[in-house]
């Protein structure tokens, strides 16, 4: 059996973040919680999410692989109000996942399961020379700035600065987070630099994988030269990790 | 002659509710107020509205049939601000209806009359086994839930419950209003059940005829098995009635 | 050299107002401030803006002609937040204008200069029989009313009234600002009439040139019979002037 209860707001955040990059996923359920990971269709980005049983109000789970059409689940979850109680409940016999929203009215959706087998994908254990922690709002704004001039951007760590840089045929854009400057907002919350490095990424992917963040969420960004960027953040106890391959400049 | 004054907000609501289903209508005006009824172009739904003279600040009306392009009237009415005074005034000679908004500025529209003759349609006097009163907001949300899985829905009354149900090829949706459960919000304000019954309707029509309701409006819904559904509500003293034919399942 | 600092909000307003009608412009910079004027591509409207050095927090300017793609500049300026500090700074060597937004983060754009030579256009010195001052919000609403019935409108001054009038095949619209009526809001702030007159204009242009006004901005409108209309307004010390040729009715 599998049955879990939580608040709608948190589950919505986790599902939205995951579904921006992948279309279907296999929830690997067991007594400890829900895990899932998947690559985007073009195998450039990897998404991994972990919802330990502690984030649920009630949780009971045997071992199950629950294959889900994320697009359909996202639309259903979007129908829930933030303060409604959300109940997930596997109907093994009918091969369906029931999603129930409970307030003074009971609204129940049944969603057919997909034949998605568990991927056993793991986020590779890479050693990164640099990492920074940054508020998601400021990072997303820098991506929007870069979007005005080109469709790829360069993330640089150099001389006490984290720089988001983009250059088009005519114009260019640059956002500088300077670790040496007093920053009351703690926009750049952490800055750990091993060696100067830079990598270039597809902007659309970076936008997709940060689309569901809230402005105050802290993103932990791991960076090296011509290495995949790793971006981690937490949503009320659930953990999201994204890995994006660099664009190798010819 | 015909000349009537009211506040823009209320008239806007009545016109919007009516114009969601029909394109043209004949306002039957007399000393008691304005009445109109029309069928939608495919003859599946009937709309009827009644604005008694008491809802107007000033009202003077001889007997007139005023044929109106509802789409044009709706756009004009949309230009009025809620707290402006609205004056309707028939220019028999020029065959136009003048619509004037008055605040510190005077804005006057003249709209050409259509050759729509009075339909003398009446809402048929059907005996219904069941009726419920429900807040429009909750009903509209249930329609949106249903929309995720199919384009028609089933309204059921059974065992102290009013159920809105939809089933697609893969997924299904169900909203249950349970008369037996304490409901502080009075979402289900009344529940009068004669016999268990169910009918299926085109979802797009139900959405159209509830599109202009406010969340707190009370809809009175009359329901039987394979019978048209009748939905009534009031807007500041004006009465709106909708009748929608059931979808006969093959 | 040219370097100027101001708040983002004001500069955004001036650039938006200018860029609604023209695509490129030459900023004529000198020690007194920035001036620019341009005609729209179809030579029906003339736009002129003046930002004296007093509107800037800091200002230093030698004589320069700075040709700008207004569409690109508008998009960049749109990325600034209202309360950020904006720094304009000419890089003569690289032939670029740098636009920097400064808050706790520094965001810098470089925009390539265009080869737009100074136009030396002047707003012609026409004597107008009438002028009115009117709140932009009320004027824009009247344009929207007119838009429902036709794509051109007539501005009339007659008998203590300023009238915005439009007539379509079926319907018509008329907004009357009556100088004789007490108007607590001072919507019609001034009314100076020399002789009754009327001119007809393309509605889309009038909408474009008032698109960036705020509801409370005072527009000074100069009007005669079959003459261009001149519309002036101020944005925090900067001056905007628009001239629009009349539509000669055949």
From Swiss-Prot, chains A, B, C:
Keywords: DNA replication, DNA-binding
Keyword DNA-binding in annotation: yes
One protein family per Pfam: PCNA_N
CDD domains reported for this sequence: PCNA
GO biological process entries: leading strand elongation; regulation of DNA replication
MF terms (GO), sorted A to Z: DNA binding; DNA polymerase processivity factor activity
Function: Sliding clamp subunit that acts as a moving platform for DNA processing. Responsible for tethering the catalytic subunit of DNA polymerase and other proteins to DNA during high-speed replication.
Record-stated family: Belongs to the PCNA family.
Assembly and oligomerization: Homotrimer. The subunits circularize to form a toroid; DNA passes through its center. Replication factor C (RFC) is required to load the toroid on the DNA.
Protein name, entry field: DNA polymerase sliding clamp
Gene encoding the protein: pcn
């Amino acid at each position: 059996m599998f049955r879990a209860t939580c608040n709608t707001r948190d589950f919505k955040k986790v599902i939205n973040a995951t579904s921006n990059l992948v279309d279907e996923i296999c929830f690997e359920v067991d007594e400890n919680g829900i895990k899932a990971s998947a690559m985007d269709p073009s195998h450039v980005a990897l998404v991994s999410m972990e919802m330990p049983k502690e984030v649920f109000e009630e949780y009971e789970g045997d071992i199950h692989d629950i294959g889900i059409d994320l697009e359909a689940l996202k639309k259903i979850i979007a129908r829930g109000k933030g303060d409604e109680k959300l109940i997930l409940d596997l109907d093994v016999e009918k091969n369906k996942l029931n999603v129930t929203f409970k307030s003074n009215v009971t609204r129940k959706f049944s969603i057919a399961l997909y034949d998605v087998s568990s991927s056993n994908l793991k986020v590779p254990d890479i050693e990164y020379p640099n990492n920074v922690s940054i508020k998601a709002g400021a990072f997303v704004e820098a991506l929007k700035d870069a979007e005005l001039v080109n469709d790829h951007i360069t993330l640089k760590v150099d001389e006490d600065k984290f720089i988001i840089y983009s250059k088009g045929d005519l114009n260019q854009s640059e956002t500088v987070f300077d670790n040496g400057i007093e920053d009351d907002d703690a926009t750049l919350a952490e800055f750990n630099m091993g060696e100067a490095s830079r990598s270039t990424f597809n902007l659309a992917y970076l936008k997709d994988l940060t689309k569901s963040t809230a402005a105050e969420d802290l993103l932990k960004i791991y960076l090296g030269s011509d290495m995949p960027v790793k971006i981690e953040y937490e949503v009320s106890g659930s953990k999201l990790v994204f890995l994006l391959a660099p664009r190798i400049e010819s």
